[in-house]
């Protein structure tokens, strides 16, 4: 379970970090256009 949890957290961060970055970029461009 420990290795599974560690891998799950690593995968989650690997997916969430770029996703949040893209969301922030998208919101930033929307605000600039409006």
Curated annotation (Swiss-Prot):
It is found in: Cellular thylakoid membrane. The chain crosses the membrane at residues 7-27. It is a single-pass membrane protein. One of its GO terms (cellular component) is plasma membrane-derived thylakoid membrane. Keywords: Membrane, Photosynthesis, Photosystem II, Reaction center, Thylakoid, Transmembrane, Transmembrane helix. GO terms for biological process: photosynthesis, light reaction. It holds the Pfam family PsbM. InterPro entries: PSII_PsbM, PSII_PsbM_sf. One of the components of the core complex of photosystem II (PSII). PSII is a light-driven water:plastoquinone oxidoreductase that uses light energy to abstract electrons from H(2)O, generating O(2) and a proton gradient subsequently used for ATP formation. It consists of a core antenna complex that captures photons, and an electron transfer chain that converts photonic excitation into a charge separation. This subunit is found at the monomer-monomer interface. PSII is composed of 1 copy each of membrane proteins PsbA, PsbB, PsbC, PsbD, PsbE, PsbF, PsbH, PsbI, PsbJ, PsbK, PsbL, PsbM, PsbT, PsbX, PsbY, PsbZ, Psb30/Ycf12, peripheral proteins PsbO, CyanoQ (PsbQ), PsbU, PsbV and a large number of cofactors. It forms dimeric complexes. Belongs to the PsbM family. This is Photosystem II reaction center protein M.
